Amino acid sequence: MKIGIVAYQGSFEEHALQTKRALDNLKIQGDIVAVKKPNDLKDVDAIIIPGGESTTIGVVAQKLGILDELKEKINSGIPTLGTCAGAIILAKDVTDAKVGKKSQPLIGSMDISVIRNYYGRQRESFEATVDLSEIGGGKTRVVFIRAPAIVKTWGDAKPLSKLNDVIIMAMERNMVATTFHPELSSTTVIHEFLIKMAKK
């Protein structure tokens, strides 16, 4: 199994480590590759788009010609996990809490509306206990950093977890979006969920 992690910025190392832990837990042999150019997506079985600055990731991906390739792979059904900024890039509809509608390069394949910087400056980063029972996990502590929020799902997209009535995790077919950082949490359940999807 080959898992590609988009590696322009954001917590690539942490995702790689968490993916390795998840593979070990599931007793699956796998390679983790850094995705920086279209060729790096060759033969990947799953894709992770980490957090970071979503506009930067989108612009760089577009410049290097990988955005269209990513979109094609994702639309063809490759299991994909987008975390924080990665969730923004997957979304069809993006608004910024401060400046309103935002024009930025997106993959835009997932039927979700996302508000960037939802929690505002006061809650730049925080930890919370969330319920991951929908994907076989339990209650677990996770980290939010300048987190967005998923404010609406439609079509085939459905919420998987909420925090105070706000959607923090959603899924549509092969795509999973989280507004928190699972790679900075103690549980590997989200990475395991992605690997299991890729194994089907």
Swiss-Prot record:
L-glutamine binds at G52, E53, S54, R116, I145, R146. Pathway: Cofactor biosynthesis; pyridoxal 5'-phosphate biosynthesis. The active site is at C84 (nucleophile), H181 (charge relay system), E183 (charge relay system). It catalyses: aldehydo-D-ribose 5-phosphate + D-glyceraldehyde 3-phosphate + L-glutamine = pyridoxal 5'-phosphate + L-glutamate + phosphate + 3 H2O + H(+); L-glutamine + H2O = L-glutamate + NH4(+). Its EC number is 4.3.3.6, 3.5.1.2. Gene3D superfamilies: 3.40.50.880. GO terms for cellular component: cytosol; glutaminase complex. One of its GO terms (biological process) is pyridoxal phosphate biosynthetic process. Keywords: Glutamine amidotransferase, Hydrolase, Lyase, Pyridoxal phosphate. GO terms for molecular function: glutaminase activity; pyridoxal 5'-phosphate synthase (glutamine hydrolysing) activity. The keyword Transmembrane helix does not apply. The keyword Hydrolase applies. InterPro entries: Class_I_gatase-like (IPR029062), PdxT/SNO (IPR002161), PdxT/SNO_CS (IPR021196). Belongs to the glutaminase PdxT/SNO family. HAMAP family: PdxT (MF_01615). In the presence of PdxS, forms a dodecamer of heterodimers. Only shows activity in the heterodimer. Catalyzes the hydrolysis of glutamine to glutamate and ammonia as part of the biosynthesis of pyridoxal 5'-phosphate. The resulting ammonia molecule is channeled to the active site of PdxS. NCBIfam families: PLP_synth_Pdx2. This is Pyridoxal 5'-phosphate synthase subunit PdxT. It comes from Sulfurisphaera tokodaii (strain DSM 16993 / JCM 10545 / NBRC 100140 / 7) (Sulfolobus tokodaii). The gene is pdxT.
